[in-house]
Amino acid sequence: MKRIALLLAAVLLLLTGCDAFDGQYVRVTPHAISSAKTPAESEAVETYMELRNSLAQLVASGAESGVIPTRNYPEASLADDIAIAQRHICTYDPIGSYAVEDLTYEIGTKNGSLAVAVNISYLHSRSDIRNITRLASIDDLENVVMKALENLDNRKVILVPDYVPIDVNQMVQDLAKANPQIIMECPIVTNDIYGLGASRLMELTFTYENSTDSQRQMRSQVKTVFDSASLYVSGEGSDNQKYAQLYSFLMDRFRYKL
């Protein structure tokens, strides 16, 4: 009796390995069970734009699999529409073209209704995708770049609406000149652009000659000088008077060789 119960349990274990669709089964091992992930289920879609947006949401969340219910979708056009949406996400969509390695789909049924099962593999981690900085306006870009320079980031990924070409290296040089007490070294910036629509994704890579620790040490030393100089030059007076005070401060504090 005990042996029969064990055999029945084994049969049930095999039958529980069902796919995202009805009536399809896969062989399951204990390792597969422990690592299996429940597919994300999207809201039901009825139009091409809803279908495409649902795919985009799966990608933006870093989901590896998902099911899109299409019970009220025109069945005759679903196959063509999902193929077009897949190409759009992988080519035109800024996050998709940056993050997606492969996006496959299968049309079937879920709970007796038409649905699309999606599987996605990525070039970047879910954490990288979710940490993309999303700007409300391109006018916010300079503040984000300044923050990256202040933090000595080696890389910054930014989603920009209404994108226009920008000389990021010139922006960084201008920020370095305007903030000498913060930016110790002007890095070389590589700007890779993803997407083909109005919104684009910018992947900025900052290359420094000096290490992060060295720059932080330099910043600490420079801050002391700036703080002292600001006290020395503070108060009312003309620009020429302040220039003279600053000159006096620098001559008293440092030795110079011509």
What are the roles of these predicted feature ranges?
Residues 45, 75, 161-165, 212-219, ...:
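Generic detection of long, well-ordered alpha-helical segments
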Residues 215-258:
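Secondary-structure boundary elements
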